């Protein structure tokens, strides 16, 4: 899978969390959000907090690898989390994830 990082960096407004994770909001309409997560390769293992998805979550791993309590998802994986699912994702390597939250996200 090829990702044009130069285009992404030129067109996405990033919010830095100071943990090696940054969030780019691509679109928001009512409670639905489409975002990018960009994670550095040497991020702390607990950079992501446990969180809940009231309306579920779908994400595509564009680069790197994501893993959580339910499995490991390499580049190219499309992952669906059902309504009211709680998880604590982790990443391996430089990771870029495209995420859709139909009804937002809440800290667990």
Q: Residues of each region from the PLM?
A:
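Ligand-binding loop in jelly-roll beta-barrel domains
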Residues: 18, 72, 83-108
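A short, N-terminal "cap"/entry segment at the start of jelly-roll beta-barrel domains
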Residues: 1-34
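Short beta-strand segments in beta-sandwich/barrel cores
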Residues: 57-59, 64-68, 78
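Residue-level marker of beta-strand positions
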Residues: 77-78, 96
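Cytosolic regulatory regions built on CNB/CRP/Popeye-like sensor folds
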Residues: 1-5, 69, 108
């Amino acid at each position: 899978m090829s990702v044009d990082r130069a285009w992404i960096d030129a067109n996405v407004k990033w919010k830095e969390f100071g943990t090696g994770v940054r969030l780019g909001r691509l679109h928001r309409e009512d409670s639905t959000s489409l975002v990018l997560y960009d994670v550095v390769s040497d991020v702390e293992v607990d950079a992501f907090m446990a969180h809940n998805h009231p309306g579920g979550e779908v994400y595509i791993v564009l680069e790197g690898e994501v893993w959580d309590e339910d499995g490991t998802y390499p580049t190219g994986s499309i992952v669906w989390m059902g309504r009211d699912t709680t998880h604590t994702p982790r990443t391996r390597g430089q990771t870029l994830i495209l995420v859709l939250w139909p009804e937002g996200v809440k800290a667990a």
